[in-house]
């Protein structure tokens, strides 16, 4: 893939030969598969009953909700080149879902997915719809961070610290299992609100893809496997962001994932990534302090200066719409972070705008 084919490179106006361009080249897998995810979601040749016009209209709205008018204009231009399909109750239900996933993903319930089904959305289309909304949430944060690193102006910039978000604490899942009420580093389970695809429903080639990524026995990944090409690109993007050498230490990438999960209210994701951060950093008490932050509390309080600036940036990037500013980048550089490390921090945070919105709105955690 050349930079001429890379949407984020174009919209963020990344100078060829700059440190940012070099960092993205170093993280080639993340760069290629973020673009691959975009191309796969917006090709609309995946056999799912979800038209390209519907996809582009949803993407335009999601990009605007997340404060990126340039990305919204990109999707609008693509949409305007297609015949008008009109507005339908089915589309209105999808827009409602998109707005919920954008602003209050932790408020989603099983009833919301039932409403989508009643409006005519198939199970495969619901998964693809959720992937699209979550992916555009990821795109907007990638673009914002690249623009900031490149010295460009951004919308809605603020130096105000972003507080921890709301989370569900009902104590019971939709199926009646015990659900966690607080953030924890303990291992949790997760159950879907709509049926995962059974393993025998995948053909041999598809089963091999699931097996290659270790997804065979996971209800979550077999649910996302209802659109396997998108899942494959998403998984490769994940690996390109988190499983690379050099740059930001892995423990701090896990901290970024935890911060995003605290902002979005995703107890399950935070349990996985806070536990990993503790294992790698040996700073279990500091990580616990982070996840113990109550709604409205400031996540960086009581942390080391290096972690404070990273947490503040990750929180600001995770807000909807994001508020991360040039001042955040300046403080990261004052703490000695290189451009590659800042890219790693930004991409780790941005990816959990995607991951949280799937985990929170397609199912829920249990602890029994």
Please report, for each region that a protein language model flagged, where it lies by residue.
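Hydrophobic alpha-helical segments
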Residues: 1-368
């Amino acid at each position: 893939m050349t930079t001429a084919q890379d949407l984020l490179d174009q919209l963020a106006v990344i100078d060829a030969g700059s440190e940012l361009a070099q960092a993205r080249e170093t993280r080639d897998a993340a760069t290629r598969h973020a673009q691959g995810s975009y191309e796969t979601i917006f090709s609309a040749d995946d056999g799912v009953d979800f038209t390209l016009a519907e996809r582009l209209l949803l993407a335009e709205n999601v990009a605007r909700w997340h404060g990126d008018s340039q990305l919204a204009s990109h999707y609008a231009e693509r949409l305007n080149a297609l015949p008008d399909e009109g507005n339908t109750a089915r589309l209105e239900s999808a827009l409602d879902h998109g707005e919920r996933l954008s602003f209050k993903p932790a408020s989603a319930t099983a009833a919301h997915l039932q409403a989508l089904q009643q409006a005519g959305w198939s199970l495969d289309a619901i998964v693809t719809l959720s992937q699209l909304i979550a992916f555009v949430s990821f795109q907007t944060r990638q673009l914002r961070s690249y623009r900031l690193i490149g010295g460009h102006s951004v919308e809605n910039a603020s130096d105000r610290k972003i507080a921890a978000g709301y989370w569900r604490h009902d104590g019971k899942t939709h199926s009646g299992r015990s659900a966690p009420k607080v953030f924890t580093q303990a291992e949790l389970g997760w159950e879907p609100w709509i049926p995962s695809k059974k393993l025998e429903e995948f053909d041999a080639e598809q089963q091999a893809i699931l097996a290659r990524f270790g997804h065979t026995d996971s209800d979550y990944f077999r649910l996302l496997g209802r659109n396997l090409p998108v899942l494959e690109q998403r998984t490769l993007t994940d690996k390109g962001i988190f499983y690379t050498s050099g740059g930001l230490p892995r423990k701090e990438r896990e901290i970024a994932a935890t911060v995003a999960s605290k902002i979005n209210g995703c107890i399950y994701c935070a349990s996985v990534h806070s536990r990993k951060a503790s294992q790698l950093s040996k700073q279990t008490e500091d990580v616990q302090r982070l996840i113990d932050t109550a709604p409205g509390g400031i996540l960086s309080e009581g942390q080391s200066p290096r972690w404070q600036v990273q947490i503040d940036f990750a929180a600001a990037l995770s807000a909807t719409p994001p508020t991360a500013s040039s001042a955040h980048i300046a403080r990261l550089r004052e703490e000695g972070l290189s451009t590659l490390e800042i890219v790693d921090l930004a991409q780790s945070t941005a990816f959990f705008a995607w991951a949280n919105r799937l985990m929170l709105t397609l199912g829920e955690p249990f602890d029994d």
